[in-house]
Each structure stands twice: as C-alpha cells, then as structure tokens.
Amino acid sequence: GKIPIGAIKKAGKAIGKGLRAVNIASTAHDVYTFFKPKKRH
C-alpha cells in the first residue's frame, strides 16, 4: 500500500523534535559538567 505523505511529514516532525530535545539535553549536560567544580587529583 501507499504511505500517505501526511504520515511521513508527521513522523519526520516527531523525529526532528526528539533529536532537538536530545541535542538540548546533551548541551545542557556539557554546560553543567563544564561549570561544575572539577575534583583535582
């Protein structure tokens, strides 16, 4: 059967939102670890 274009667009938008959320989360984590006082050995 043919997949409707609307379904593909909806899936693409959902994936895009998920990737953006992951990017924001990893960036926030990087910033947090950068500013967190490091334990000196």
Curated annotation (Swiss-Prot):
One annotated GO biological process: innate immune response
Main location: secreted
Keywords: Amidation, Antibiotic, Antimicrobial, Immunity, Innate immunity, Secreted
Subcellular location: Secreted
Highest rank taxon of the organism: Eukaryota
Tissue expression profile of the protein: Hemolymph.
Pfam families: Moricin
Keyword Secreted set for record: yes
Induction of expression: By bacterial infection.
GO cellular component assignments: extracellular region
Subunit composition and interactions: Monomer.
Purpose: Has antibacterial activity against Gram-positive and Gram-negative bacteria.
Protein family: Belongs to the moricin family.
Protein name per its UniProtKB record: Virescein
